[in-house]
Regions:
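Conserved Lys-Pro-Asp/Glu-containing loop-to-beta segment of HAD-superfamily phosphomonoesterases
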Residues: 9-12, 57
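TOPRIM fold recognition
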Residues: 4, 23, 29, 37-91
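A short, flexible N-terminal coil/short beta segment enriched in small residues
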Residues: 1-10
């Protein structure tokens, strides 16, 4: 299967998210490490730099995902953020 090429970097929450997404998307994928992004100045600087031309934020629809999106919105200009949402699935 050919991977979908995406030019903008994608921000996801964890390693599993990155691993899964890497299976079908050809893009730069950065993990937040969950809430560790709040204190990781190096990762924040990387995300700021990558976000200069735009960035895709793909987080869970739960409370944690919302907090991470809100935090990223505070460090990247809002016109550079493309939020994608993973819906909650109830079984």
């Amino acid at each position: 299967m050919e991977k979908i090429k995406i030019s903008l970097p994608i921000i996801v929450e964890g390693r599993y998210d990155k691993s899964t997404l890497s299976g079908f998307v050809d893009a730069t994928i950065i993990t937040t490490g969950g809430f560790s992004i709040f204190n990781n100045k190096e990762k924040q600087a990387l995300i700021r730099r990558l976000g200069e031309d735009g960035i895709i934020v793909l987080t869970d629809s739960d409370g944690g995902g919302k907090q991470i999106r809100k935090f990223l919105a505070a460090i990247i200009p809002s016109d550079k953020i493309h939020n994608l949402y993973i819906p909650c699935l109830l079984f």
